[in-house]
Each structure stands twice: as C-alpha cells, then as structure tokens.
Amino acid sequence: MLPAATSAYSRMIVFGDSLSDSGQLPDVESLASGTIQSLRFTNRLAPTYRAPSPFGEVSAQRLARALGLKPLLPSTSIVRELLDLPDGTNYATGGYTTDDILGSITRPEGSVVGGVGLTIRRRDGYLVTVGEADPEALYYLNGGGNDFLDGVVTDAAAATASAVTLAQGVDALVSAGATTLVVANLPDIGATPAGFQSGQRDLLLSLSQVFNQVLDERLAVYDGEVAIIRLDVGALFDEVVAAPGDFGLATNIPLSNACFSVSSCDISSYGLAAGTPDPSKLLFNDTVHPTTTGQEILADYAYALIKAPRILSLAGGLVTDSLNAQHQLVGSELRPGQQDDAWRIFVHGDYREDQSRSSHYVGETDAVQRGAGIGAVIPVRQGWLGATVAGRDGELEAPADVELEGLAFSLFVRQHLGRVGSQAIVSYGDFDLELRRRVTLGKAERTLSSGTTARGWAAELRLDYRLTAEESAWYTAPFVAYRYIDTHIDGYREEGSRANALLVSDQERDEHRAEVGLMMDRSPQGGVGVFAELAWGEHLNDENDATEVRLASLPTNRWSGEGIERDKDHYLRLDTGLRLTLGNARLQAGAGVEGWDSLEPHFQLSAGLSF
C-alpha cells in the first residue's frame, strides 16, 4: 500500500463512473445477513470473498489516502443518509455515462443514484451546490466506458460526442475556479472480458482511440492555463498485460478474457468458483471492473504522476548544493591564518552531507557532495587574489536517484582596510546529471531514466571587523555574509515506461542566504594554527517552483504543483580546524556541522606550498 503523505490539496473531488465509485449504492447482498454497507465495483475481501465480506477500495479512495487527505466518501449515498452521516465529495456513480457525469457537476438534482427505472436518491450537482470550485482541491475525472457498454457509442461520431461531453465537465470546473485536475483516458474497451464476449474487439479498440484523441484535443486548450494531470490508462493497461508477472498477476491465462467473480468469465483456477480463489492474480473482477490489484496499480500510477514534479525538482537542489559546497571549500582558503605574503599553490577537497529540503510528497533528501581541486593565491596590496578549479560530484539517493558530475571554477579575493576585512567569491559550474525516478505500481516497480546538463553561478560577499590587535596572532572578528546562487537544468525526456515517462521542462532555481557569526583564527605559531567559526544563517527565499512536466505519451497538458521548500529557513553552522606548517608547506584540515533539527557534517582538507 502507498505511504500516506502530507497533502498539498484541501480535498479530493471525484466525478466519474463505477471505476471510481466509493459506495453510492447499498450492498444488497449483505443486507440479508444484517450487515449494512456500501457496494463498490471491485472484488470483496478475504477470507471468503463473498457477502457479507466488504468490498475492497477503488483507486480513487486509495489515491486520496496516499495524498494524506480525508477518506473519500460518496456524495449521494442512501446508506449514509439513512444513518445520518455527512455526504462526501465523490460524485462518481456506477453506471454513469459521460452525460450523467456532466450532470453531477452542473445540473440541479444532477447527482442521481439508482438502478434501471429506479431513483434511490438525488441531489444537486457539485457546482449547483457550491457555486465556485475550491481552487485548492484536486479534481479527478474519469468516464466514457459506459457510453460504449450501453450502446451509446457505435461509431466515430458518437465516440467524438462522448469525449466532448466529458471535456465539458472539465470546462465547467475550470470556469468555476478549479486549478488542478486529474483526467484519465480510456483503455481499450475491447480488451476486457465484456469486449471479448461482444465479438467486437477491433471496433471497440478503434472507437476507444477516437474517444481518446478527441479528449486530448479538447483538453489541450487548457495547456498553461490550469494544471491537468493526464492519466494514460490505455498505456498502463497495455504495460500490465505485456508483463503480468511483474505485477504479481497470472502468466498462464489471457488476462483480458478472465475475471474473478462472474460465471461467464470465471475461467481460471484463481476465480471465485475455484477451490482456492485469489483475485490478486487477476486483472478483472467481473466483465469490466478491475480487481483490487488493478485498483491498486491505477492508484499508484496516479500518485506517482502527481508527485513527480516535486521529486524531479530535487535535481535542482543538488546543483545548488554543489555550488554552495564549492563556496565553502573556497572560503576555507581565505581564512586569515591561512595566508602569508608569498605566492601559494594548493590542492584541496571536501565532503559534505545534506538533508536540507522537504515538501509535500517529498521527505528529507539524503545527498552527498564531494569535490577536489587545485588553485593558486597571490598577494595583492593588503590581501590576496586567487583562483581554483575543482571537479565536483554529488549523489541524491532518496526519494529519487540523481548523480551529478562536473567542474566548478572560482575566483576569490580578500582585502583588509584597517580592522575591516572583506572577501568576495564568484563561481561557475558546468555539470552532467543522471536521473532515475522510481515508480511503484502495485507489486511492480519501474525506473524512469534520463540524462541532461546543468550549469549555474554563485556570488558571495563577506565583511568582518577585527577585534584583536593587528600584531596579535589571533584574528577574532564578527562577520556578516550574503551568498546568491542561480542554476539552470536543461529539459529532458524520461525513458523506461511508456505509461509513466515524462517530458521535463527546463528548470530555473535560485537561492539566497545570509549569515552572521563570529570567527576566531590563529596563524601558525611554532608550526601550529587553529581556527573556529560559529554562524547563524537564514535562507531568504522559502521555496522554488516545482518542475513543469508533461506525460510523454499524452503531451497535450503540463503540470507542476507545489514548490520545494525547506522544513526550516534558518540554520546553525560550526566549523573548527587545525593547520600545520613545515617550511614552505602548509596543511589545513577542517570539519563542521550545519543544520537546525539535525546537523549534517562536512569536512575539508587542503595542502599548499608557498614560494
């Protein structure tokens, strides 16, 4: 089951048919045993898989829970009304055509629950009730299957009209203020037990393709206006059927022909009529509806696409952190006790861990930064001027795998004017990135791989005021510092799963941080020097926008979502170290920690020769 996450949405509001119905109708079979519960269109649960065992959850319910939202309850349930329980926000109802779905959004008394010729309960459609759509909610729409199964769609013109009707529901929600919508297309209706029994698989496939193409064209008008997260259910279905073993499904039967609980398609040893029924091995519960295994796969799929922009945004953080680490490494060469009046060449390196960023759907990031470089310093007036080039690499291991490798170039200067010390650093980095986004789909896992390039620059200014006398071996000074970092990642395309692969846009990211602190530095006396620095820092920008993405198989619409932000805007940094001199050679080693609730370590080592 998917892990719950803190939600970026106020609620989830669903419109659709039986695939998303979370219990509008009563469970008539269970009433005979005195059990009052709701019907859902999937298999019942173990141990008996028969009434009065409850039905499993549909994908929309699973998705709401994964997003950290309240339970997704039916909007028009007679059971909840009789028990005096509040209505929910799931308007999806078994048997709904696209016209019924539109009615549940826009019409007075448009949310209707009942059977053939019988209405059990009705209430106003969503927008009739609320007037304006909640802009913070996540809207989920699916539909169209019943238009095919009920004989409404028999030709291309009818398939076109059906798709237009579903899109009109999107039109109404967007006009009323909805900003984020999940919209699913149709799988191949012919590749179901019902399609097999109809003898019209080829026709149903062709008309399903017409429906999906028209829906794509209608939704494309909202590209850039609102976020529409497309679900390519057709591609997902094809992927599952092509590799059923990956998903824990049976590999010895035609999954498109078999089902779990209906005699007309209960043709396997896993069906309800078998001695050891096991719905987890089958894709269909009846002639059209998924088992709980299918529902879980679809929920996982939707969840992965919703959270993908935040996950992919972490690559920008790795690039930013690489330049930040470069500046801290260069800053260690500018410590007053590290300098003399001679030319100096040096090699240096660093290692640091970062767990600084989190957001909704993204927990703490575990990243490592490493660098090794060579540089030179020359005396200029009352200070020093230098340059360095360093090879840098970084890794981010959770919740996505990102590897960074490249070069960072820095120019730096320090000057003294009386008791006032000033220093500046400017850096440029050019990096290659390898990214791997892991997706869980029920029991299956998919890895989406990609590669791209990144670049960025950073600038830092620092001022300090020396408290100790000029002739003292100690340089003790309070300081203030400001650092700015700007990065760019080129867009790329993921590979590894047609249903999941994304087109990722260029990413821009910046970071501003300021520090105040106290530094203490003793130049080498008898060949030994020490230093220490304590700083309080503040990140001046709270978040960066999440990455814009499109589904590669349905590129008509883009979405991003909530940006990446830190748990804490402030931090403490402590650095200490030791330096040794032997003739013209000098070795400096430093270590420190940075953070607030948790402290991440960093280490630096430098060796130089003066002449």
List each language-model region with its residue ranges:
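Conserved active-site regions of diverse hydrolases
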Residues: L2-Q338, Y351-S358
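Short beta-strand segments
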Residues: V14, A92, Y140-G144, H348, ...
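Solvent-exposed, glycine/polar-rich loop segments of beta-barrel outer-membrane systems
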Residues: V152-D155, A159, P193-L204, A243-S264, ...
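Transmembrane beta-barrel strand/turn architecture of Gram-negative outer membrane proteins
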Residues: F211-L215, A220, E403-Q415, A459, ...
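Outer membrane beta-barrel transmembrane domains
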Residues: Y301, I345, G349, S410-R414, ...
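Outer membrane beta-barrel translocator domains of Type V secretion systems
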Residues: L314-T476, R566, Q588-S610
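Solvent-exposed flexible segments
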Residues: L467, T476, A481-I489
